[in-house]
Amino acid sequence: MDNSTQKDQHSGKKYSRKANKVQKGFTAAYPTQSSIPYKYQPLIIPESEKKGFNSQAKRFYHKQDDIPGPGFYNVIHQSPVFDSVSLSKKGTCTFPSMCARLDTIVSKFPAANAYTIPSRLVSKKDFSNSCSSMFQLPSYEKVLKFETPAPNQYNASDSCCKQANNVCARAGFVSKTQRGLFTVSKTGPAPGHYDVNESLVKQSPKILMSCFKSKTDRGLKLTSTGPGPGYYNPNGHPKVQKKTLIPRNPILNFSAQPLPLPPKPPLPGPGQYEIVDYTGPRKHFISSASFVSNTRRWTAGPSQPGMPGPATYRPEFPGKQSFLYNEDNKWIPVL
């Protein structure tokens, strides 16, 4: 009795443990089978078959329903560093590198919240609320103020330009011409609307003339005292005038004294001579044989009566004729 009761109690404890404790599956892309029964029975594929040739792609996945199970989305892949026994720790290439892969990067600088900025370094004016600092004046530069007045902020006085006393040195010959603005009378005539009296020089013409008129005479030709064109020959020799020699002792002659030769006529001026064409008429170049024939060309023979003239008839060459039947159904041989 005691043994049976102890077995029952012991067996009851075992049953109670299995009944009260619920197995929790691994929450990943491929959830394991849970202890709670449900409608669909999934197929369990071992993990060794899913890993093939260092690939992390999903293989041998069989989906039974359209409803995603727990852990079906937000998949977290495994680490690229494999700890499998089948893979070499030194790599799979020909010359593996001994350097460690995927080292943890440790920053050499402190984090943003690891230090505090002193208050004296913080700018009193925050430019981030308005515009960028590159479009504003620098805060550390002092703006220079102009101490001189503007062009319209003072009245110029003429007292500094005038002479203050008579003690200072002055020039010996001081000009008495007044300086300043030239007052133009409004009633005077405009330039060119009055005549200048030039009666002292010459009589002024009654036309509109300029106020500043030149007194140089225009249109006057000076009489030349030298010879004109063609009056002398620059290539000739100067002429020596021959005087008539009258003998002092006259001799009894039966003839008069010889007279000198008449002078040569002057050279002709422009337009007094005719231009002679010494080149002759222009030659007409015609083709001729080396031995020119004396036979007459274009000789028209005597016309014979009854002969037709040129272009009175039109000779025609007989064409090829066929052996087909004509209108008379006769054979026509080829000539």
UniProtKB/Swiss-Prot annotation:
Keywords: Apoptosis, Cytoplasm, Nucleus, Phosphoprotein, Repeat. Pfam families: SHIPPO-rpt. It comes from the Eukaryota. Residues 1-20 are annotated as: Disordered. GO terms for biological process: positive regulation of apoptotic process; positive regulation of mitochondrial membrane permeability involved in apoptotic process. GO terms for cellular component: mitochondrion; nucleus. Its main location: cytoplasm. It is found in: Cytoplasm; Nucleus. STPGR repeats lie at residues 68-75, 110-118, 149-156, 188-215, 226-255, 267-284, 308-317. InterPro entries: SHIPPO-rpt (IPR010736). May positively contribute to the induction of apoptosis triggered by O(6)-methylguanine. This is O(6)-methylguanine-induced apoptosis 2. It comes from Bos taurus (Bovine).
